[in-house]
Amino acid sequence: MDENQPSLKDDILKGIDAIAEFIGEDFWRTQRLCTKKAIPAAKMQGRWIASKRKLRAHYDRLTAGQTT
């Protein structure tokens, strides 16, 4: 395993609550984003999971070139 990458258990968020907290959204909005595949998440055995690394890359792409 690459020393710069976190272990899988440290990278994976399990459940809408954990994903919502990580991206700074509420439960219902996060569930909608997952269901509509607006963020990189998948359902595994009935539970939503997402990679912190992939979520961060997704939001980096969305905000690339934007200034405040």
Where are these regions (language model features)?
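Glycine-centered, phosphate/nucleic-acid-interacting loop/turn motifs that mediate DNA/RNA or nucleotide
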Residues: 37
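Short helix-start
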Residues: 15-17, 40-64
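Polyanion-binding surface elements
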Residues: 2-33
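Short intrinsically disordered terminal tails
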Residues: 1-3, 64-68
